[in-house]
Amino acid sequence: MNTGELVDLGQQLRVDSVRAAAAAGSGHPTSSMSAADLMAVLLANHLRYDFERPAHPGNDRFVLSKGHASPLLYSAFKAAGAIDDEELLTFRKLGSRLEGHPTPQRLPWVETATGSLGQGLPVGVGIALAGKRLDHADYRVWVLCGDSEMAEGSVWEAAEHAGHEHLDNLTVIVDVNRLGQRGPTRHGHDLDAYARRFRAFEWHTIEIDGHDVDAIDRAYGEALSTKGQPTAIIARTLKGKGVKAVEDREGQHGKPLPEAEEAIAELGGPRDIGVRVHEPEAARALHSAGTGQTELPRYDEGDEIATRNAFGEALAAVGTARGDVVALDGEVGDSTRAEFFAKEHPERYFECYIAEQQMVAAAVGMAARGRVPFATTFAAFLTRAYDFVRMASISGSGINLVGSHAGVAIGQDGPSQMGLEDLAMMRAIHGSTVLYPCDANQTARLVAEMAGLEGIRYLRTSRGESKVIYGPDEEFPVGGSKVLRSSDADRLTVVAAGVTLHEALAAADALAADGIQVRVIDLYSVKPVDRATLRAAAEETGCLVTVEDHRREGGIGDAVLDAFTDGRPVPRLVRLAVTTMPGSATPAEELHAAGIDAESIEATARMLVEQAIVP
């Protein structure tokens, strides 16, 4: 398009943003209006995208990081012919695909859910990494950010990583409209303040007037021709551009324009400009979902193997069988054992350094490009990336997260390293799967299972060695459990997983020597939980004792209660968990101090029997 046509298209995008928000009675039209010219030039002159084939491997990828400006995105979809005007006016209404913030579960042209600011660029880095190192394709990744979100630390994790990886297929456009939600942003219209920061991370930067369509066009062309480094286009804009009543005025964020019809007239009225978006380059998917039978590692019963070791060996084996599996780690691969994958498949291993938000975001970006990512770090450090996990669920993203060094059983490193909240936070994620293996063969099987699941999958692994109690051919279906001790004379049931499963078995054997029979359930699938087995145990033994190397809130005890949320009577339940603040000690001392070792389980069972709390 020529200059006049681009100006007209920008005005159309503003008008349609105003109309959509007015029809909804809510939304963010002023945030959309500031970026309308930036979007118009990109859509008409530079984006290569087949809207009829959103999965085309050669399509450019666009991420609207400032997701509240969704009216602008939907107006662009209308201009490209992907939606019609009738659908545009369903914005924010019940049943509409056009939600307040865009999600890929509703619209196939959306790469990732945004709206929690500071996430679009990190995910865009993941997509760009896939393009450069995995797909070896010529597609471009464009990310439109707001200036307010430049205060987010995750943005600068992404900027540093993109510069380090020389992602010249990535362009970020920063819409510097000066105003955030409650008032001015930190740097206002100081474009150089943003440019200096990007340059410090080895980006090429371009500062422009974000309402000069010719300058925008030149900047995009310069970005496309820049080699060896990503490009940041810093654009000075005005919030509410084009409507005097709201232009560059505070207090106009997140609300429809009060006089929408007058605003539309001031913008020149509705238009019906259609954009013929450039076709993508021919490309093909280079990875395969499967190349052969997975030959998992096999461990002998009775051996002492850390589940983290089994995870690393199993992941390497799954990577051999599946070309779509990739691994990411937060610079602790020698501890998580992700290094085993790195040695076997270095071209599919991504070192993300101590930047857990960027690591999870990169996993989401790679999943958007059809990969099956496994992202690993200490369980405790995944808490830092929790909002990215939450948003990944909203995206419907399929990612595998693995948290090692879980619980007090890590010993002397102390509480800062102990993941004690991870089961709770991962169980709370919509549609998640949470797995906690107790031995090496179980771990290997569950890693293979995870690769074929949907949604957010979490595997909890342990630092210390544990005895192999299952054979290598044992099956562990997700949603299942294993009953390891059982008799007709069971007085109660102990439910455990991971480290405490071994403690429960030792306690059960000691009790059995004194004639007290105890059932033991290995609840390796913490979510979904095996309701049938738990209900049967409650009915047959009358009392459940849960034991977990985790906080009481949200972990195995609460997972067990989920089996009785359909109106069934809740059984007598005793919950042993970590309730104090641990310190530094040996693993055995830590487990005992927390009251979750074999001795504590045995004492609890004896108390229940001796005080006739259980029959």
Where are these predicted regions, by residue range?
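Thiamine diphosphate
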Residues: 1-142, 272-460, 465-466, 613-615, ...
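Residue-level marker for buried hydrophobic side chains located in beta-strands
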Residues: 143-144, 172-175, 402, 436, ...
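Short active-site segment of divalent metal-dependent hydrolases/proteases
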Residues: 150
